[in-house]
């Protein structure tokens, strides 16, 4: 692979960085390589905004407003949205992810954005921060996302003002994480919604199962089918163009 050149700041990332971290359901962390080097979380954040929305509104409401339709098209495809009866498709493609973030809208933009980072920090058992240079870079190159959001808004499938919501979505994607952070974040889902690092309950088992069942066919976009075939559907993965992959193996 190669770095994401359509976001200038991500194009500067060292492509030779490589780290692996594993956090088991007892909270034990094992790491090798560049496990303390921060990268932008990018689309992995979609998993956590979905969890946040489900925690706040419940499965039924989020399912009805966001949808869970599969797609063979790229994650930011306007055509994919147009071809879907509900337009949003699912929360793991950009249009559905931004619609999910719009459900979490607050009039105070600073508090709105900070709530998204705080939510991810709860899963990481660590105070995460936003990469300001990444955020600035992405904010200058998010025209497609803005177009998708306005398309959804025109069909009443976007639930807050477009510009602050897309800004908040860009902000959450610019959060910096290490592989250690990602491992601890994944461990919450592996442990049925309980953070094994501090024993805090973040999701119910039912909510966790719903999220994972819908992550499986879309977490790696058009490569998800190949992933399922290779893993037997036992590992749930979410990728991000920042270079990270989060993998959940329930019970381990």
Give short role names for the model-derived ranges.
Residues 190-252:
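Structured C-terminal helix/loop/strand segments within mature extracytoplasmic catalytic/sensor domains
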Residues 1-32, 246-247:
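A short, well-structured edge-of-sheet supersecondary motif
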Residues 166-169, 173, 177, 192, ...:
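Cytosolic covalent-transfer regions centered on His/Cys nucleophiles
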Residues 27, 40-63, 185:
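Active-site SXXK
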Residues 47, 53, 176-195, 244, ...:
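Active-site-proximal alpha-helical segments within enzyme catalytic domains
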């Amino acid at each position: 692979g190669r770095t994401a050149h359509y976001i200038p700041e991500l194009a500067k990332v060292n492509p030779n960085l490589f780290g692996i971290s594993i956090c088991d359901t007892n909270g034990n962390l094992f790491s090798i390589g560049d496990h303390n080097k921060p990268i932008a979380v990018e689309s992995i954040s979609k998993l956590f905004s979905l969890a946040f929305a489900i925690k706040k509104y419940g499965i039924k409401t989020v399912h009805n407003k966001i949808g869970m339709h599969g797609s063979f098209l790229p994650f930011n495809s306007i055509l994919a949205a147009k071809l879907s009866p509900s337009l949003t498709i699912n929360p793991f493609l950009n249009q559905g992810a931004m619609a999910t973030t719009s459900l979490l809208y607050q009039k105070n933009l600073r508090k709105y954005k900070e709530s998204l980072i705080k939510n991810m920090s709860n899963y990481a058992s660590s105070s995460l921060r936003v990469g300001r240079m990444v955020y600035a870079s992405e904010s200058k190159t998010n025209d497609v996302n803005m177009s998708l959001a306005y398309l959804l808004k025109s069909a009443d499938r976007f639930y807050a003002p477009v510009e602050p919501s897309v800004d908040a979505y860009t902000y959450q994607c610019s959060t910096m994480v290490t592989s250690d952070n990602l491992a601890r974040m994944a461990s919450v889902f592996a442990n049925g919604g309980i953070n094994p690092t501090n024993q805090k309950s973040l999701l119910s088992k039912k909510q966790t199962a719903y999220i994972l069942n819908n992550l499986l066919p879309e977490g790696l976009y058009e490569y998800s089918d190949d992933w399922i075939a290779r893993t037997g559907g036992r590992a749930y993965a979410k990728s991000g163009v920042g270079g990270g992959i989060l993998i959940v193996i329930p019970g381990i």
